Amino acid sequence: MSQLKRILLLNGPNLNMLGVREPTHYGSLSLKTIEQDLQSLAQQYAVELSCFQANSEEKLIEKIHQSFQQIDFIIINPAAFTHTSVALRDALLAVAIPFVEVHLSNVHKREPFRHHSYFSDVAEGVICGLGAKGYEFALQFAVSFLKK
């Protein structure tokens, strides 16, 4: 029997405040609800999903490093680190795990400083502006990608 594919969902700073933080941009669902919904989908897709959120760059980098040869695909919402973190980008490149970048809001409809991402050019794909559904689409893509 083949081993379950392992997918890691990484969420960056302030996403622990989903549901109360700027719901016009980020929606009204909590991160816990989003993660529970994704766990149900992961079971349907017969993949193993682990979830991790941190407000510190160091903790996110450590989690990426720990994923080396342990995780098959990463779904990441780097949040504000999208626009600032060369270190997170380098960590993803170092472990060479394919990933999709997800943003709840359409970053291109927001402030100009949010228009640049340190991740998009090295990601398998980018999903933005679709709210919590974006995570579902990312998981669906990850499953499809891993079947190749």
Swiss-Prot record:
One of its GO terms (biological process) is amino acid biosynthetic process. The record marks R21 as: Transition state stabilizer. Pathway: Metabolic intermediate biosynthesis; chorismate biosynthesis; chorismate from D-erythrose 4-phosphate and phosphoenolpyruvate: step 3/7. InterPro entries: DHquinase_II (IPR001874), DHquinase_II_CS (IPR018509), DHquinase_II_sf (IPR036441). Its EC number is 4.2.1.10. It catalyses: 3-dehydroquinate = 3-dehydroshikimate + H2O. Keywords: Amino-acid biosynthesis, Aromatic amino acid biosynthesis, Lyase. GO terms for molecular function: 3-dehydroquinate dehydratase activity. Homododecamer. This is 3-dehydroquinate dehydratase. It comes from Pasteurella multocida (strain Pm70). The gene is aroQ.
